[in-house]
C-alpha cells in the first residue's frame, strides 16, 4: 500500500524496455506530489498497532520495489515469515530528509521504518487502498489478510538436490 505502489503497473512497457530501472524512478518522481499518509491498523500474532504510514509492504525478498535492499541475513526464504515493512509518515521536512537519506543507503535502522518478521498479518484501513501484487495491480481493499505458507514450495538446484536453507 501507499507511496509508489502503482508505479510498477503505471509505467508504460515501452518506457520500461528503453530505460529499465530508471523508468520506475522517473515515474515515481512524477507522482511524488501525490503522496499522502495512510492510516493503517496492523494485526499480527504478536501485536496490534496503528498509525499514519507512507508505505506498507509485505514481501519475502531482499529487495522491495527496487528502492530498498535488505541485508542478506535479514531475510530468509524458508523461515515461514514475511518481512512486513512500514514507513511512518514524517512529521516535518527534517524527518522527511532523514528518511530519504536513510532509504538511499538502505539503512534498516531508520527511526521512521519498522521491519517486522511475521507469519501472518491483517492490515485494515478506513478507505480502500491500492495493492500491488508482484508488480501488478492487486485491486483496492480495506482489509487484507496475508499468511505465509511455510514450505509450500520446494526449490531444487540444477543438480537435482533440494535446498534446505536459503538465505
Which ranges hold each PLM region?
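Long C-terminal subdomains/extensions of small-metabolite kinases
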Residues: 1-167
Amino acid at each position: 500500500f501507499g507511496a509508489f505502489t502503482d508505479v510498477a503497473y503505471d509505467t508504460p512497457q515501452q518506457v520500461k524496455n528503453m530505460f529499465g530501472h530508471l523508468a520506475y524512478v522517473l515515474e515515481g518522481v512524477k507522482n511524488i506530489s501525490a503522496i499522502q499518509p495512510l492510516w493503517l491498523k496492523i494485526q499480527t500474532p504478536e501485536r496490534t498497532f496503528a498509525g499514519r504510514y507512507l508505505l506498507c509492504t509485505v514481501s519475502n525478498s531482499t529487495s522491495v520495489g527496487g528502492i530498498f535492499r535488505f541485508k542478506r541475513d535479514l531475510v530468509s526464504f524458508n523461515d515461514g515469515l514475511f518481512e512486513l515493512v512500514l514507513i511512518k509518515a514524517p512529521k516535518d521536512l527534517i524527518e522527511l530528509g532523514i528518511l530519504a537519506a536513510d532509504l538511499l543507503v538502505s539503512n534498516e535502522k531508520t527511526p521512521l521504518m519498522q521491519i517486522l518478521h511475521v507469519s501472518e498479518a491483517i492490515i485494515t484501513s478506513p478507505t480502500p487502498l491500492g495493492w500491488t501484487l508482484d508488480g501488478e495491480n492487486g485491486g483496492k481493499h480495506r482489509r487484507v489478510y496475508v499468511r505465509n505458507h511455510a514450505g509450500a514450495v520446494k526449490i531444487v538446484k540444477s543438480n537435482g538436490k533440494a535446498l534446505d536453507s536459503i538465505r
